[in-house]
Design a protein with these regions (language model features):
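Short, basic/aromatic beta-hairpin or loop at an interaction surface
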Residues: 155-164
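N-terminal targeting pre-sequences for secretion and organelle import
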Residues: 166, 171-190
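Bacterial N-terminal signal peptides
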Residues: 8-18
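Gly/Pro-biased beta-strand-loop elements
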Residues: 29-146
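Boundary at the C-terminal end of the N-terminal hydrophobic targeting segment
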Residues: 22-24
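Bacterial N-terminal signal peptides that target proteins for export
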Residues: 1-9
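Short Gly/Pro-enriched loop/turn and capping motifs at secondary-structure junctions
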Residues: 140-141, 153-155, 171-173
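Histidine-centered active-site/metal-ligand motif
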Residues: 149
Length: 190
């Protein structure tokens, strides 16, 4: 695809699809304290890259953790050494997000004969964010934002197939996104 064609495609997409909101559709749970635990400190997430799972816990007043749910997630392909591990937190929660493919993602798609635009709108079959996006404070070695997001293709969930992010079934991810507030602790294990 030529540069002129790409520019024309981008302009066409801007006409056909509304531009994303400047701040995204972020949520923040402002509910009052529950059982003496502030909302941002109420939940704890642990993600296992090798175990392809995400576990949600509720923190108890005594400092313990009560397991609530474990979800399968798609994680980074074996040998891909760009993902961060360790503690962090949720920095944003978005519904029906746009996808801004990284240069690496665009390269992979180009190798498959698909020229991705710089921004892929919600609902588009090539939007790999699915129905939700949860941004994390974790960053890759190159400074890219790390995310938990939906998967429009369910075969990606529960396997080591992503370019680094965590892919969940859309319905399960929406459940998670509606449960946790921004500020929730997240620990990523290898």
């Amino acid at each position: 695809m030529t540069m002129t064609s790409l520019v024309n495609l981008s302009l066409l997409m801007l006409l056909l699809f509304p531009s994303p909101p400047a701040s995204g559709q972020q949520t923040g749970n402002t509910a009052e304290k529950v059982r003496g635990v502030p909302p941002a400190n109420r939940y704890y997430i642990e993600i296992s890259i090798s175990g392809t799972s995400l576990s949600l816990y509720e923190k108890a007043a005594d400092g313990g953790r009560v397991p609530l749910r474990t979800y399968p997630v798609g994680t980074a392909v074996r040998g891909l050494d760009v993902y961060p591990t360790g503690p962090g937190k949720v920095t944003g929660i978005y519904f029906d997000p746009w996808w801004y493919p990284t240069p690496y993602s665009r390269k992979i798609f180009r190798e498959r004969g698909i020229d991705l635009p710089g921004a892929v709108p919600p609902g588009h079959p090539l939007n790999y964010m699915g129905k939700f996006k949860i941004t994390l404070s974790h960053k890759t070695r190159k400074g890219a934002i790390y995310r938990i997001h939906g998967a429009n293709y369910s075969w990606r969930v529960g396997k080591r197939v992503t370019g680094g992010c965590f892919a969940m079934h859309n319905d399960q991810g929406l459940e998670l996104a509606r449960t946790i507030p921004v500020g929730t602790e997240v620990n990523i294990l290898p």
